[in-house]
Amino acid sequence: MFRNTIRKLTLKPGVTISTGFLIFITIGTVLLMLPVATADGKGTSFIDAVFTSTSAICVTGLIVQDTPVYFSRFGHMVILILIQLGGLGIMTSYAFFSIAIGKRLLISQQVAIKGALDTGYAEIKKTVLVIMLSTFIIEAIGAVVLAIHWSGEHFGDDIFYPIFHSISAFCNAGFSLFNDSLINYSGDVVVNITFALLIILGGLGFIVLSNLYGVFAFFLSRNSKRKLNLHTKIVLTMTGILIILGAILFYVFEHENTLDLLSFKDKVFVSFFQSVTTRTAGFSTVDVGSLTSPTYLYFILFMFIGGSSGSTAGGIKTVTFFVILAVVYKMFRGKEDIEVFERTINRRTVQKAISITIISILTITLFCMLLLYTENVPFKFIIFEVFSAFGTVGLSSGLTPELTTIGKILISILIFIGRIGPLVLALILGREIAERKIRFPEERIVVG
């Protein structure tokens, strides 16, 4: 009976994905605790190693130790590998190495990969190879651009800097080898555009990138049959709207605060960059601790939304947020069907979107209460850190390094939950919804 239970659990995609993340968190923790991983040769404490490993593999970027100073080159390499594996996705990375050595994937692994990448079983191998190839090409281009641009810097001969930051940006990780993130490059056009493009591409998701590649390839072959699917259209629409809206809000709220001493050009670049990075990546070109309260509030909303499904980003995802808005809009219009771009979104998708949102809100509320109990700091900073952790963003008001041991553990758990997703967590803890042959009579209830 016990074996049967274990066997059923391992067949669940959520369990497979979560187990993979936990294994790599453990490996990363052990490696970061080694004396060779730190600059002083003493190794990282267990709690700090767990936190850093979790933050890296879950591509978050929240830190409890100053990454560029505290860790050695070996420690930086460990963090970078964790970021790359976490950005690609544990199952995608495992599938790639299995394909490379000719090993067959287990059924549970195929189910997990199929769910994560929205692909058919027959196309798993092709999809994984395309993802790996496109990832390395994009990251390589980003690294080359940064290496050329940074050639005059004091670290100009060190190719590790551009490689580290290119991977961190594309994987939306937010880890940096600079003490003040990208504040010193707030007016640098090349750095702003390169990082922004890497972050946007990583935040769109492999499903969208694959669809865009397919459309582009068919366009070049003069075959117009391949079109953008509904998912891609929604993602591109929401991404564009959120970037523009975020840039405008940041400029309005900060033009007399953190942007006050900058030129108009630099104000525009900083506003654009912060809008891009706030939902997903966690890099910053301003002092986050000095932001106005309205900016904190809109940052919190953007971190909650996050990036797109199948991407390196966290949050409830742009498509989920779009579906929620569409449901509300259609209810006000007195319509039952959710119709978008001449397509109807099915009820199961709507139920998933609502479930993800509610579970996310409940999770965030719980962790806010726990941290308010364990940490003696204002609510404003607690809620900002909680949303940043859940959305795997990595922006911090400066609270994270000052957390108590219990606080660090709570944030680590929240980062993990935010990365694997509320829906996956619900699948692990509960039973899958099955179709019932017998249904009870329907009856109206009063809500609102």
Report residues per predicted region.
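Membrane-proximal intracellular helices of multi-pass ion channels
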Residues: 1-448
